């Protein structure tokens, strides 16, 4: 069985973070492991508190996993501090982890901040260069590049800038665009667009976590990056369309929609 490691935060309501990752991995028939970066008191309406794992304990979790069970892919989600980023880089480099998918989580669906101001720069310097692909949304790409993104051409420009600076592939997600839900992949100087219809649903809690873990799962299964993204987008579209009407805010996806 293929193995995927998720390095991310815990969502007490189960819709995002490692809980969404494990559900997604199970739906893809891969074995999921986790290293928890933070505990969040969170529900469909927002994040009320965050308790970070110490960098040392985060490192111990990754060491415990990878020293015993090698992984075929990994995904990184919420990393609140630069110190955590450094530990993650050290461990992933030590174990030569391949097929790394980095979702540079800065803000929750509800709007709550999940990353300290200096962390993004350290992440870009240490983790992006060892990644197979990074998956920023439009607000995250704007924060990382300083560019304003209002069109497809702007998306291509931002993805190209991020890709050239980091040396990895970039999947810039267009779900925050006013146009549609299409995403653009920049890899090796080429753009590939993945067209997607906007699904009218208020139940979108954990979409970024789910997409990145679906991509990692498909990479672990041996699919090339464009195919892994295509399959992941098909999965998440189904999961959003079947979204669960739970809670008072943005409800979760149905991760088991195809099972």
Provide a role label for each language-model segment.
Residues 86-95, 168, 182, 190, ...:
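Nucleotide and nucleotide-moiety/phosphate-recognizing core
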Residues 7-13, 191-205:
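Short pre-catalytic strand/loop immediately N-terminal to key active-site residues, enriched for Gly-Thr
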Residues 19, 142-143, 201-225:
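Short, small-residue alpha-helix embedded
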Residues 14-30:
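N-terminal basic/disordered segments at the start of proteins
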Residues 52, 226-259:
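Charged C-terminal helix
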Residues 1-6, 25-109:
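Conserved N-terminal subdomain of the carbohydrate kinase-like
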